[in-house]
Amino acid sequence: AEAIQSMMRSASGQQQLIGPIIVQPYTHIYWKETENKTTREEETVYEYILPEKLNIQGNLQVTPRQLGIYKAQVYKTRLSFTGSFPTQRAVKSSEQLIPQTAYLTFLLSDARGINSVPELQLGEELIAFAPGSNMNNKAGIHAPLNSSNLSDGNFKIELDLQGMESLAIAPVGRDTQYHLQGNWPHPNFIGDFLPTQHTSEQNGFAADWQTSWFATDMEQKFGNYAATEYDQNLPTFNVSLIQPVDQYQLNERAAKYALLFIGLTFVSFFMFEVLKGLRVHPV
C-alpha cells in the first residue's frame, strides 16, 4: 500500500544483511591490443574471504505504527555476529596483481536503520566501522584491515538495527547458525531456508536456522579475482512480520462483495431481457 511505502521512506524499510565478508581488492594490470597498438590497462578485481563459522543471535522488538487506517510493523533488534575467518591464507602479489587495503564489509538494504556506530572486534583489537560498504556504492558499513588484524580470525560484531515488515540475512559462513526471537506473535518464515525448529505463541516467537556451503553454494556465488563483485541472488534466512486480518480489511471485503452481488443481479436481469425479449419490470 502507498501508506506503507510512505512510512518506509520516512523511517527505514525492509532489511537484508549480507556479511561479514573480508574483501581483498587487487589492481589487475593487463595489456590490451587495439588498432595495431598495445595499451596498458588497469581494473580492480576482488578476492572474498567468507567466515569459516558464523553464529548470529537476534532479539526482535516489534512496535506497530499506524498511518490512517494502515498499520506497519517497525522493529528494533541487536544482532550479534560471532565466528572465525580462515587465517592460513596468502595475499597474492605479482606484476599483474597488486594488493590494495583489505576491509571487512557488511551490506544492508537500508543503512538508515543503523541506530548506533558498531565496532568490529577482531582477535583482541577493536576497529571502528566507517559508513558505506565500499562495494560499488552499495549501502552498508566497512572496516579497513591490515596484516596484523588478519592474524587472528576470531571476530565479534554487534549491530543495532531498525527496520520494517521483514528481516533477511544471507548465511555467508561455511557453517552458519542463526537464532532469532521476538515479541511478534505472527511471524511468517520465508526465504530460501525454513527454520530447523520454531515456536510461535501469543507473546512472541523463537526460531533457529542452520545451513552450510553445501546447501547455499555461497563460495561459488562470490567468484574471486573478477571485476564483477558478486552474485546478487543470494539465499537468505527471512522472517516477515505479517498483520492478521483486521476489522478494516473485513469491512473492505464486505463492501466489495456487496457491490459484486448487486452488480451481478442487474446483469442477470439485463441478460434475461436481451435473450428472452421479455421485460422483467413493466415500466
Task: Enumerate the language-model features and the residues they cover.
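Soluble non-transmembrane domains of integral membrane proteins
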Residues: 2, 9, 23, 35-235
